[in-house]
From Swiss-Prot:
Protein name: Protein SlyX homolog
Protein family: Belongs to the SlyX family.
One Pfam family matching this protein: SlyX
Origin organism lineage: Bacteria, Pseudomonadati, Pseudomonadota, Gammaproteobacteria, Alteromonadales
Family annotation (InterPro entries): SlyX (IPR007236)
Length: 70
């Protein structure tokens, strides 16, 4: 009987440890979710800002003729 009690105690300790680990991981997931949400909002704002920028009057480098030494 003593062996069974010992095994049950070990299982209870492992379960308690796992519960603690799961709670820590859950808190990390919540924090990361907040970080991702913030980054998505920042990306959305940057995209809106980029789309509202007027195009430049300068020609793109691909449209420019190469310098005479080429």
């Amino acid at each position: 009987m003593d062996n069974i009690e010992h095994r049950v105690e070990e299982l209870e300790m492992k379960l308690a440890f796992q519960d603690g680990t799961i709670e820590e991981l859950n808190q990390q997931v919540i924090k990361l979710n907040d970080v991702v949400a913030l980054q998505q909002e920042q990306l959305r704002l940057l995209l809106n800002k980029l789309q509202s920028v007027e195009p430049s009057n300068m020609a793109s480098q691909a449209d420019e003729t190469p310098p005479p030494h080429y």
